[in-house]
């Protein structure tokens, strides 16, 4: 539909008053216009299709640069006749000149539609059915003025009205009535028109798809029923009732004439009606068939698109699964250190396969991301378990070393016990009996008993290690892949690093009662990392029990040694507090922060682990030999302690005037730059002790 508003032409003439006299249509009315062009169009159903066809014809003529030709339009009861306009016209005749070149000629009943363009009121057109080809042709014209185009359209409408009114009048006349308002010449003209129409219908022989009753144009409704009103636009469509009446009246003009049979013509009309109904049904069936076909095509296209989308989604899921598999393989390569003899039976690969099988049935990306995070938490747990296993392996190695050392000590004791009696006692008499064979037998029996005890301890240790490994394997198998990562992690402890480590006492050399005889020569578990190797931490969140509960004798020895060392530390702390010498705390292996906080001049003097380790490496012997050896070690340690800590001392006086001696062992300040900083002892020697102590000993 056109977007511009419909502008009516200013026409002061009333529509109820005819534009032309009825007698003029029997002679013909002539108009001058320009012929734009014509084109075959399908049967129009709406006004929009007619307007589109009209504008399409104008556009094509403009594109092809076709010149508009001046024509003369003759409108009469015979029809609309379009001829070329001559340049020189001698005289005006009401009759048509046979020498004129005829372009178009359509009878009134074949005109289907007449209208003008709402956007350009100078343009008008009409659609008529061609008799030879039985197709619709749209002819477009352009007038000189807008009012002239309106007059041409109304003239065509009035011509149809005159024909319709004449047929109604002829139908109301009786056959014997000779009175008539119309002259004999006019009746002859109407009869000739009707005969010509019937002959054309007979020539078609029922080949038309449309009956003549729909081919006539109903410009105005029946005058007997309605009064003419001024329309908003001049789109005039035919009505079924008027078409039937006009067709029947035109046919009755000759039917009621004498000597003409009425039955064949009525049969022809009935056959035409049936043919029209069948043609209408076939058109409806074809329309439904085309609609179903279009729906089928759209459904097939939608199905093809859906299949393509599913294929694309399957390809994306396959790529995601391959990526997950590659991530699992990458994690396995990173955790290659777990494949040791202790955890060779850990079901890592089976769990990854189970994860891949579970994710292959799940296409949701959120669950895939959650499972990837679960993999990360599982890897963290596996690494922590691997650290625990490595610590257990180190502990087992330390136990083996301890057993070897104990065996060596026992062998040395046996050698010493065998060498001592031979050197101390003279050989016995030849004839007398000696008690030494019985003593040797007792010693062999005691050695056998000790060996049996050692074997039992080793068996208990091996069983305990096997139980620990089984427990770790069970924990590995019990890891839930689909669990929440926050639940799978170990429980945090109260420390700042969320993990508390304890030192396994069995990873160190046990302190026997012979070694613990001296106060300072005993083994100290607190500060002796270099004596027996590194201590392996074990998280309390994963192992809360003692891994070597079966070795009762070793645990008892270790407990006694720890208690004795703690007692020695307490005595040394008391002596240091009473004497004011905080440097003596270094012999115990720990630095007291409570006493050093009172003086900023106190310097750290940690004892060397090598000196302590030299005191701890004491081979056990007999009871007498052990006592002598312990006494010597005590004297050596005390003398070395006095010489080591009395070399550099600082005298500090407090506010009360008491003097105390503090160790001034230098602790060098490390710098990242090349700046040379003097030693702390050199700096403190230049400070006055009294003024310095007033500010620092509060």
UniProtKB/Swiss-Prot annotation:
Residues 201-217 have a biased composition (Basic and acidic residues). One of its GO terms (biological process) is postsynaptic actin cytoskeleton organization. Keywords: Coiled coil. GO terms for molecular function: nitric-oxide synthase binding. Residues 25-194 form the PID domain. Residues 396-423, 448-458, 590-640 have a biased composition (Low complexity). This is Capon-like protein. Residues 191-240, 396-460, 588-698 are annotated as: Disordered. Residues 265-327, 379-484, 554-583 form a coiled coil. The keyword Coiled coil applies. It comes from Drosophila melanogaster. PANTHER family: CAPON-LIKE PROTEIN, PHOSPHOTYROSINE INTERACTION DOMAIN-CONTAINING FAMILY MEMBER.
């Amino acid at each position: 539909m056109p977007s511009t508003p419909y502008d009516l032409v200013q026409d002061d003439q009333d529509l109820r008053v005819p534009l032309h006299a009825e007698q003029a249509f029997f002679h013909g009315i002539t108009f001058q216009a320009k012929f734009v062009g014509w084109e075959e169009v399908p049967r129009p159903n709406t006004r929009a299709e007619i307007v589109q066809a009209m504008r399409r014809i104008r556009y094509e003529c403009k594109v092809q640069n076709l010149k508009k030709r001046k024509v003369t339009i003759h409108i009469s009861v015979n029809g609309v006749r379009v001829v070329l306009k001559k340049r020189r016209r001698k005289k005006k005749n009401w009759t048509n000149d046979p020498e004129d070149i005829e372009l178009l000629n359509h009878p009134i009943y074949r005109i289907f539609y007449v209208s003008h363009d709402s956007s350009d009121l100078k343009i008008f057109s009409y659609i008529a059915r061609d008799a030879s080809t039985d197709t619709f042709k749209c002819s477009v014209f352009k007038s000189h003025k807008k009012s002239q185009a309106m007059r041409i359209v109304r003239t065509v409408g009035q011509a149809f009205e005159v024909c319709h009114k004449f047929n109604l009048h002829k139908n109301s006349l009786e056959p014997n009535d000779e009175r008539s308002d119309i002259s004999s010449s006019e009746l002859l003209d109407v009869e000739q028109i009707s005969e010509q129409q019937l002959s054309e219908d007979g020539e078609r022989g029922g080949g038309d798809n449309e009956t003549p009753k729909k081919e006539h144009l109903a410009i105005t409704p029946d005058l007997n029923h309605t009064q003419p009103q001024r329309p908003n636009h001049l789109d005039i469509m035919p009505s079924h009732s008027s078409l039937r009446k006009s067709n029947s009246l035109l046919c009755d003009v000759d039917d009621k004439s004498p000597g003409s049979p009425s039955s064949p013509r009525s049969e022809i009309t009935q056959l035409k009606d049936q043919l029209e109904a069948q043609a209408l049904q076939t058109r409806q069936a074809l329309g439904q068939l085309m609609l179903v076909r279009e729906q089928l095509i759209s459904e097939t296209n939608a199905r093809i698109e859906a299949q393509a989308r599913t294929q694309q989604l399957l390809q994306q899921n396959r790529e995601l699964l391959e990526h997950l598999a590659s991530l699992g393989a990458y994690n396995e390569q990173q955790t290659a250190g777990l494949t040791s003899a202790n955890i060779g039976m850990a079901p890592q690969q089976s769990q990854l396969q189970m994860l891949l099988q579970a994710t292959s049935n799940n296409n949701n990306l959120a669950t895939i991301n959650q499972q990837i995070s679960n993999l990360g938490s599982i890897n963290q747990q596996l690494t922590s378990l691997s650290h625990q296993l490595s610590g257990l392996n180190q502990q087992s190695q330390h136990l083996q070393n301890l057993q070897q050392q104990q065996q060596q000590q026992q062998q040395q004791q046996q050698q010493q016990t065998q060498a001592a009696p031979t050197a101390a006692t003279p050989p016995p008499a030849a004839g007398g009996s000696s008690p030494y064979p019985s003593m040797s037998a007792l010693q062999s029996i005691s050695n056998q008993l000790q060996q049996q005890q050692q074997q039992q301890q080793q068996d208990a240790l091996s069983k305990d290690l096997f139980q620990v490994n089984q427990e770790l394997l069970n924990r590995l198998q019990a890891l839930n892949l689909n669990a929440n990562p926050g639940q799978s992690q170990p429980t945090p402890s109260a420390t700042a690093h969320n993990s508390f480590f304890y030192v396994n006492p069995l990873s160190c050399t046990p302190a026997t009662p012979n070694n613990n005889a001296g106060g300072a020569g005993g083994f100290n578990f607190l500060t002796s990392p270099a004596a027996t190797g590194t201590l392996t931490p074990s998280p309390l969140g994963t192992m809360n029990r003692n891994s070597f509960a079966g070795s009762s004798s070793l645990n008892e020895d270790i407990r006694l040694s720890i208690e004795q060392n703690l007692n020695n530390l307490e005595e040394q702390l008391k002596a240091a507090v009473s004497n004011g010498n905080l440097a003596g705390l270094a012999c115990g292996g720990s630095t007291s922060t409570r006493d050093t906080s009172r003086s900023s001049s106190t310097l750290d003097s940690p004892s060397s682990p090598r000196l302590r380790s030299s005191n701890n490496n004491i081979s056990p012997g007999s009871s007498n030999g052990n006592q002598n050896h312990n006494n010597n070690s005590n004297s050596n340690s005390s003398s070395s302690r006095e010489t080591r800590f009395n070399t550099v001392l600082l005298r500090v006086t407090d506010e009360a005037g008491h003097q105390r001696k503090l160790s001034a062992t230098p602790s060098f300040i490390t710098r990242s730059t090349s700046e040379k900083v003097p030693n702390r002892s050199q700096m403190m020697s230049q400070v006055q002790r009294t003024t310095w102590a007033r500010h620092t000993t509060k």
